[in-house]
Amino acid sequence: MKKKSNHLKGRKVLVSLLVSLQVFAFASISSAAPTEPNDIDMGIAGLNYNRNEVLAIQGDQISSFVPKEGIQSNGKFIVVERDKKSLTTSPVDISIVDSITNRTYPGAIQLANKDFADNQPSLVMAARKPLDISIDLPGLKNENTISVQNPNYGTVSSAIDQLVSTWGEKYSSTHTLPARLQYAESMVYSQNQISSALNVNAKVLNGTLGIDFNAVANGEKKVMVAAYKQIFYTVSAGLPNNPSDLFDDSVTFAELARKGVSNEAPPLMVSNVAYGRTIYVKLETTSKSNDVQTAFKLLLNNPSIQASGQYKDIYENSSFTAVVLGGDAQTHNQVVTKDFNVIQSVIKDNAQFSSKNPAYPISYTSVFLKDNSIAAVHNNTEYIETKTTEYSKGKIKLDHSGAYVAQFEVYWDEFSYDADGQEIVTRKSWDGNWRDRSAHFSTEIPLPPNAKNIRIFARECTGLAWEWWRTVVDEYNVPLASDINVSIWGTTLYPKSSITH
């Protein structure tokens, strides 16, 4: 009996041991199993949006406009022609202005919504994990990266200053910065058009350069803007493997949703920021020449042509303005001049990065947290391209010195435009048409600046029964000129003529 009791006790101990082993094994398997996916990763992955549509901007839509207009001014006739154009751009390099510097630092979390598209991004403020930022200054090698605790505008800016200081103290004397210059130019037609063409907020251009958009639309002025961006260095934020890598463990997707994250406003991160200086140059003229754009482009490439050449008249009626953002901007905060060589000096001055000529955040790029794809703003705008043509008055000088009786016929069309821009043509005739003129006869016929389709005809009386009148001049569509000289001479059988203008 005692042996049996001991045997039962042994079996109980064995069973207990097996149960303990199973519990331990189950616990070990449970602890080794993969953890549940972070709800931030799941929430952002589940956002449903089209990245090409969420940042699409529908700019000006023009349904009606007056295609042509005629203006009488100071003895001249000015024709303003308007043509509807469309412009589509998808910039990924977004310009930075002072008002948004604290919303566009490397690693900043933004919302992809209309505010972002309008260059006034909204931030998502939440507790963050440390963030690695790096700089591409030459020579730093392993010293080019720093980990930022609690990344925000202040801490990231401080870290960037530290990286720049390290380069300045250790490597600036042995390493030079490569020249990285971005250049763009465009004629100005409307606020949305120039904003899209140069990828900059039109309000900034208007506030710094003073563009008179109304004068441009009315054809009173022609304006070109050139943008020079000189990049000294770029600071990049480390891209996360998962969105949750950016946020503290205490942050949930529900918190991000409360702070604006949604299908209509998915989250972004500023992946890199370019630092340097930006120079905006405004070229403005009151010239009505159709060669203004060509003249301005040539001047931008070669300022020495201002004093001579075929476009001298355009330059004499032009003024130039330059505004510098970044670097030692106080040296050339705003320069207004009629000498483009002064503008060229502004562009060349302070082109080297140094402690006295610091860099300024000039542009940034953001990525969608869902897949790290680049956030591009898709602009689509319509605008009116305005072309002005100025016509001056002219005159026809008739001179008859031939040995015969002559008759002249002169007429022309005068054109204008109605309120809808439709051309109105009125036929005008010289009151001396078909009168007999003997030598020597000379007269001047004034022509208004809106004259066209000029017709000049002259005939002489031969005295021959079978050919009483012989044509001497028979010209249609003579172009309007300040002086149109018509001369006839010779004899009845051998009349001569010439027209010069």
Curated annotation (Swiss-Prot):
GO terms in the biological process aspect are: killing of cells of another organism
Notes on activation and inhibition: Inhibited by cholesterol and thiol reagents.
> Could you give the subunit structure recorded for this chain?
Homooligomeric pore complex of 35 to 50 subunits; when inserted in the host membrane.
Motif Conserved undecapeptide covers 460-470
What start and end residues bound the annotated signal peptide? Answer: 1-32
User: Main localisation, per the record?
Assistant: secreted
Query: What is the gene name?
Result: alv
Similarity-based family: Belongs to the cholesterol-dependent cytolysin family.
Pfam families listed in its UniProt record: Thiol_cytolys_C, Thiol_cytolysin
Q: Where, by residue number, does the polypeptide cross the bilayer?
A: 191-204, 211-220, 289-298, 306-318
Q: Supply the alphabetized keyword list.
A: Cytolysis, Hemolysis, Host cell membrane, Host membrane, Lipid-binding, Membrane, Secreted, Signal, Toxin, Transmembrane, Transmembrane beta strand, Virulence
User: Where is the protein found, in the record's own terms?
Assistant: Secreted; Host cell membrane
Q: What is the topology of this protein in the membrane according to its UniProt annotation?
A: Multi-pass membrane protein
**What functional role does this protein have?**
A cholesterol-dependent toxin that causes cytolysis by forming pores in cholesterol containing host membranes. After binding to target membranes, the protein undergoes a major conformation change, leading to its insertion in the host membrane and formation of an oligomeric pore complex. Cholesterol is required for binding to host cell membranes, membrane insertion and pore formation; cholesterol binding is mediated by a Thr-Leu pair in the C-terminus. Can be reversibly inactivated by oxidation.
Gene Ontology cellular component terms for the protein in this record: extracellular region; host cell plasma membrane; membrane
**What Gene Ontology terms describe what this protein does at the molecular function level?**
cholesterol binding; toxin activity
Q: State whether keyword Transmembrane applies.
A: yes
Motif Cholesterol binding, per the record, lies over 492-493
Query: Is the keyword Membrane assigned to this protein?
Result: yes
What is the designated name of this protein?
A: Alveolysin
